[in-house]
Amino acid sequence: MFKNYPLLRSLSLYRYMPYRLALTALLFLGANISIALQQFSVGQAIDHLKHAESASIFAHSFTDPQNPWFWFTVIAVIASARAIIQYLGGLSSLIIGQNLLTILREKIFKQVQDLDIKWHWKHGLGEVLTRTTRDADKLKEALINFWRQVFESTLVVLVSVGLLCYYHPLLGLVPLLFIALGLSILFHLTNKMVVLDHHVGLAYEKISDSLAENIHGIRVIKAFGLENDKSNQFRYFIQNFIQRSVDAISFGARYLPIPQIIIALLYVWVMGFGAYLISIQQLQIGQFVAALLMANMLVFRIESVGQVLHIFADARASAARIWQMLDVKPDIQDGDIEPDFRADLGLELKVEGLSIQTETGKFLLKNIQTHFKPGQIVTIVGKTGAGKTTLLNTLNRFFDPSQGRIFIGSEQQGWHDTKNLKLKSLREYVQIIPQENFFFSGTLAENLRVAKPDATPEEMTQALYLASAVELLERLEHGLDTVIGDKGVTLSGGQKQRISLARAILKDSPILALDDSTSALDAATEKNVLQRLKSMSDLKTSGPQTPKTIIINSNKQTTIALSDWIIVLDHGEIVAQGTHTDLMQNSHFYRQIMGFEQPSLSPSSAVYEEI
C-alpha cells in the first residue's frame, strides 16, 4: 500500500516499539493540551483581575475561580506539569530515535549480507556506506521530527483552533484556512526539494566511492604516481557535492518564506477581528489576550513545520534509496534441506549440464559435465577468462547456473541438488578459498577462528603447519595474538595465502576448492603445501581425518604435477579432461596453454624440472 511512499512506509518501523510509542504519544498529547490550557488560563486570570479592580482580590477564597490568584496558581501548576511531561516526552522520543536508527542499520547490514555476490559487483562500497550512515541518519531525524512537528503540531492546531472557535467561530475557522493554504504550498515545494536532495545524495555517494577506492587502492596510486590526479578528482567530487547542497539550500531559502508569510497572516486576522469583537462587546480583554497567544503559537508551530519540511524532503529521498536496497530479492535463494552427511566417508560433487549465460546471451559456462571425487586433487586449467573461477563459484552457490544442476553426496549417502540445501549447510561442506585474501582487523588467532570459533591454539598451529606457515608464526612477536592489521596489511602476498589456506584447513570441510590460492607462493613452499593437502585427500592415509575432495584453479605446473585429474576449459566449455600424461599426448590445446609447443619435449620430465 505504501510502497510508493517510502517515508510513510518507514513509519512501519514503529511497530518494533509499540508500548514506548503509545507512551510517547500520550506524553506529547498531555504536553500540548497543557499549552492551550495555560493560555486559556491566562485569559481567565486577566478577566477576573479586571473584575476585581473595584474589589479586593482577597474577597474570594483562593479555590474560588472568581479569584485571580486561583488562575495564577492553575497557570503555575500547568506550567510545572508541562515542563515535566515535555522532558519525559523528549527523552522517550530520543530513545525511539536511537532505536529506529539501530533497527535501520541492522536491516541494511543484514540485507547487504544476504544479497548475492552479483549484486555487490554492481554496487560500490560508497553506496552501501551512504545508505547505512547518511541516509539512515536523515530518516531517523525525520521520524523523530514526525513526533516533534507533525504529531505535536497537529495537536496544537486542533486544540488551539477549537478554543478560538469557542470564543467565536470565525476567530478559529479563518486561521485554519490560512494554515491549509500555507501547508499546501509547502507540500508542493517539498516535491522539488526531494529531487534536489536526490542529486545531493548521488554526489555524496561519489565522495564515498572515491574515498573507499583511494584508500583500498593506495598502493596502485603510489605505484603509478596518481596522487595529484586522484586528489583533483576527489576535489571535483567535493565541489560538486557542495554545489548540489547549495542549490537545495538556496531553493528553500527563496521559496519557503512565501507560505510562512501566508500563515503569519492568521495572527493579523486574530488581532484585527478580535479587536472588532471587543468593540461590539462579544469578546473580553482576557479572551483577546489568550487568542493572541494561541495565534502566536500557531504561527510559530506551522513555521517550524515549514522549516522541518526540508528535513522531510531529504528523508523522502533517503528513505527511497534505503527501501530500494531493502526490497531487492537475492538471486540466490536459501534451500530448506540440512543433510546429515558423514564427512568421514567423503563427499562428491556431480556437475550435470551446467551453463551460465549473461543477460546479453553470452555463455560464461556451457554444458559442463564432470565429477569431483574424494581422495583426488582435481585441477582446472585454461586461459584467462576461460571460466575457471566462475565454475568454482557455482559449487557453493555464489552463482546459480542458468541451466543444469550440481549434486552433492555419494552413492552410499545419497544425492542432493545443491539448490535445495540451506546455504549455511552447503558452505559447511564446500569451502572455497577465493583469490582475494581478506582478513578482518584483529589478531591472527581471531582471523583463524573465523573458520572454527572454538579452535584451540594447538589446532591453529597444526593448520598453520599444514599450510607451511608455522615459520611465520614463529617470527611474529606475539604469536597467535599478533594483530595483523586491517585486511592483513602487515603481511606479504605469500603470507596472506598461507594463512588463508590454514583457515580453510582448520574448517576441515570435506570439499576444498582453491581459486588460484597458491599463486604468490614460491615453488618449494607450494610443493610442500600441495603435498600435505594431497596426503589429507588420500583415502588410504588420511586416518581419522576427513577425506578431502580438493579442486584447484591453477595453470602452474607445480600444481599440475600433483594433480590426479585435470579439467581443461576454453571459452566456458570443457575441451579435454584426464591425467597430465594423457592430456600431453592427446590434447594440442592443453600442450599450448602449458607452454609445451615442441612435440619432442618430454612432458613428464619438463613438469618436474619446473618444481
Residue ranges of each PLM-predicted region?
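Juxtamembrane loop-to-helix connectors within ABC transporter transmembrane domains
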Residues: Y5-P6, Y14, S93-L94, Q113-L158
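Transmembrane helices of ABC transporter permease
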Residues: Y16, R20-G30, N145-H199, V270-L283
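Alpha-helical segments in transporter systems
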Residues: Y19-Q44, W71, I75, G90-S93, ...
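Transmembrane helix-loop-helix hairpins at lipid-water interfaces of multipass membrane proteins
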Residues: L21-I85, C165-L170, Q281-I285, E411
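Hydrophobic alpha-helical segments in the permease module
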Residues: W71-R82, Q86, I179-L183, F187, ...
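Loop segments that connect adjacent transmembrane helices in multi-pass transporters
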Residues: H123-G126, H199-D247, I337
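Cytosolic ends of transmembrane helices, especially the final helix of ABC transmembrane type-1 domains
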Residues: A203, I207, K222-L226, S250, ...
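ABC-type nucleotide-binding domain
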Residues: R342-I611
